[in-house]
Amino acid sequence: MKKKKSNYIIALIIIYLVLVYFFNVISDHVNIKNIGINKTSDKTFKIISSTENKDIEETLKKYAKENQIDLQIDYAGTIEIMDKLNNGENYDAVWCSNSIWLYMLNDGISVKNSKSTSINPVVFGIEKSKAQELGFIDKEVYTKDILNAIRENKLKFSMSSPTQTNTGASAYLGFVSTLAGNPEVLTEKDLENDQLKKELTQLYTGMARSSGSDEFLEEMFLNGNYEAVVTYETSIININKQLESQGKEPLYIIYAKDGVSISDSPFAYIDNKNEEKADEFSRLQKYILSNEGQAELVKTGRRVWYGGTNENADKTVFNPDWGIDTSKYIVPVKYPSTEVIKKSLGIYQTELRKPIHTVFCLDYSGSMYGEGNNQLTEAMEYILNEEEASKNLLQFSSKDKITIIPFNTNILGT
């Protein structure tokens, strides 16, 4: 086991979790569109929102109540939101992390009047003493400078999964673009470049821990012993507030000079041919974009100014000691087409990420007889079928190790 420690991240997946997730995925694709699950009522205005918007919920619900809008907000990760909408769950508006995901919705979903509500860079946050050691303080840092620090085993970082979260995907696409030399348009041919793949693989050798959600990443970082994290600027601001309240060293934010991934937090209407809902959406969107609504977003560490710059930004939020300079223009990464995004994420899943060792413990006890056993079989057929699993970027790579342990009262086959 020690010999394989550097090559494998060992994950134990308990089968009831597998069933809950994968059977739900299967059920979604088979049944949801037919039965109209979660169809919105005539009165309730339903928003499906990325989890990072929870900190603005109280303000938005207060406005809705004062303006006779019966508002319901459901939260999920951005990529999960796309799955929910594509699988037929009905909402009146979507408030996701990044506009790139709206282009991945099915053609039958009519999304209108999408407007960016804030700007949130996805950046490196490094312990200030470590950033000083690396020579990153008060210096223009490029992605290859970070890569070199990782190559020399001087830097380890944590981040969310590129295939399951917006922050992970956005950061990854930023790495791809900058290491490819920032082409005017990133193409599928660019993704096949062996040197690019080599550098991306080297960069991800520095990933000490990965998380399936941004919320867990923040919690994991605060409770662990990590020297760097890749996440939203807003998240690092929140992490630093907590670190300083505990008397701990804050993180120093690095904005790569050659390009930073930006999340634009679009708020968009899902047209269900309901004039009353369209009017309610318009009022909610106008409030979010009003001076009052934007001021509430700024309090949480979001940038709402043109180009993300404002020399008069609140220094208690955008603290210069943390490497934040709101007077400087952030160079945004150019996102590629939807097809190239899908291709690049597939390459990460099958070629670039660290190999994993997944252990499936399959329950064949009497309580699983009948429907339970059928669900178990369907779940395993789904996750082990590369073509099916790849639809949700859950496929294994040839480097992964899979162990299956069937059991009832005892482990079977021993």
Identify the meaning behind each predicted range.
Residues 7, 30-32, 306-359, 366-374:
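Acidic, polar low-complexity linker/tail segments
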Residues 36-164:
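N-terminal segment of the mature folded domain
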Residues 61-65, 143-216:
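Ligand-binding cleft/hinge of the Venus flytrap
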Residues 116-124, 150, 163, 197-203, 245-273, 278, 287-308:
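Periplasmic-binding protein-like
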Residues 128-140, 264-299:
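Extended ligand-binding regions for polar small-molecule ligands
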Residues 183-255:
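Ligand-binding pocket segment of bilobal, Venus flytrap-like solute-binding proteins
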Residues 353-414:
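Von Willebrand factor
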